[in-house]
Amino acid sequence: MSLKHPTIAVSAPGKVFLAGGYLVLDQEYTAFVFGLNARINIIAGDIHTTAGVQLTEIVVDSPQFLDAQWRYGYHLAGEGGGIKVTQLQVGAQINPNPFVETTLSYALTYIDRVAGHRPSHSLASARLIILADNDYYSHSESDTTRSGRFAKFPVTLSNANKTGLGSSAALVTSLTASLLVHYLPEDLFSIDSDKGKRTLHNLAQAAHCAAQGKVGSGFDVATAVYGSCRYRRFSPATLNKIPEPGVAGFADALVKLVDGESEWDVEVLKDAVTMPKGVVLRMCDVDCGSKTVGMVKKVLAWKSSNPEDSKTLWDELQSRNEQLIATLNAGDVAQLPEKINAVREKIREMGSASDVPIEPESQTELLDALSTVEGVHGGVVPGAGGYDALALLMKDDEETKQRVEVFLEKWAAEKGTKVKLLAVKGEMEGVRSESLDVYAGWV
């Protein structure tokens, strides 16, 4: 009898980087990140075969999109190389999905190593279904077929227009969590325990960085696991020690990294951020996501060539970020506009100094105008900035929401742009188990 759970569901939130963009790249500074109620959901279950038929296959479906099925074979590599995953052809061509494929290799390798000594353990074939809440993607009503939380989109996943809410980190985190919950008994992994969350965090960080091909700051994975938090990044060298999946020693190196508390100098403080009663964090979609990689490189080049000036600016921006969060924590709503504007002032200064449009003029104009709408305390261009979704702090009532929607409709018509208030809201909770009832019609 297998120890695994037959069919389970988990979800992980997206993120909005309210304060600490760019600063998060340096361990001297911290970031303040909020989770969102837009979630990436994964349902994991067995594949049922006829008697005598044995499969070693993982099937991954993303039924909201066209041609979105990936099939993978897997086997145990020699010399401690872990579980090697190979994409199988579906239809006329292979469409790679590096985030899914890498996560499978990492998660299955870890699972096989920690549970492999148990006689009842086996990595049986499984089917995974990915469902993304609608606000992860820009879309017009005419483009989609609505089905509650999960729209059907008439495009392939690669052609979907993301809204910048952190879908890759939420995907890797929820995918990793679903595999751990599905295959491992609760005495080896519990999604609700501190130890379980630490295991999930470390494993998802490793998989996400490998899938990206670089070591990022990790704030998006940390938020997907823990929810809203103050975050100080881990040393990039933490993840330099792992060979590729299938290469000798991969399994041992991965388990040592995931289970070794001393390896991680990351700091995630959940209690350091709160949202006052009656205030909500909302997002505006500006319908043209930024290419943040080039922007980050330019800002870091400026910092490197101007060490003294950049340190002075970053120290002051860190101080202003902390004052904004302290104001939120204290529930001092009247002070929010002043504190938000103080942060924005330094962000524009950094953008000007580095010649990077962190808060472009068009976004400045829109944020300034939105801040005059009754019930809106202010807003920022979150994260790395650019022409992405805006984050607003506003009164949490229907009247304010309607005023903002009317304002944006008028603004879009006058300026000839696409901008709208998303349904998504800030949320404190991170990864969690879900009831299968939520996914009726999709499973």
UniProtKB/Swiss-Prot annotation:
Phosphomevalonate kinase; part of the second module of ergosterol biosynthesis pathway that includes the middle steps of the pathway. ERG8 converts 5-phosphomevalonate to 5-diphosphomevalonate. The second module is carried out in the vacuole and involves the formation of farnesyl diphosphate, which is also an important intermediate in the biosynthesis of ubiquinone, dolichol, heme and prenylated proteins. Activity by the mevalonate kinase ERG12 (FG05912) first converts mevalonate into 5-phosphomevalonate. Pfam families: GHMP_kinases_N. Induction: Expression is regulated by the Zn(2)-C6 fungal-type transcription factor FgSR which binds directly to the promoter. One of its GO terms (molecular function) is phosphomevalonate kinase activity. Pathway: Isoprenoid biosynthesis; isopentenyl diphosphate biosynthesis via mevalonate pathway; isopentenyl diphosphate from (R)-mevalonate: step 2/3. This is Phosphomevalonate kinase ERG8. Its EC number is 2.7.4.2. The keyword Metal-binding does not apply. Keywords: ATP-binding, Kinase, Lipid biosynthesis, Lipid metabolism, Nucleotide-binding, Steroid biosynthesis, Steroid metabolism, Sterol biosynthesis, Sterol metabolism, Transferase. GO terms for biological process: ergosterol biosynthetic process; farnesyl diphosphate biosynthetic process, mevalonate pathway; isopentenyl diphosphate biosynthetic process, mevalonate pathway. One of its GO terms (cellular component) is peroxisome.
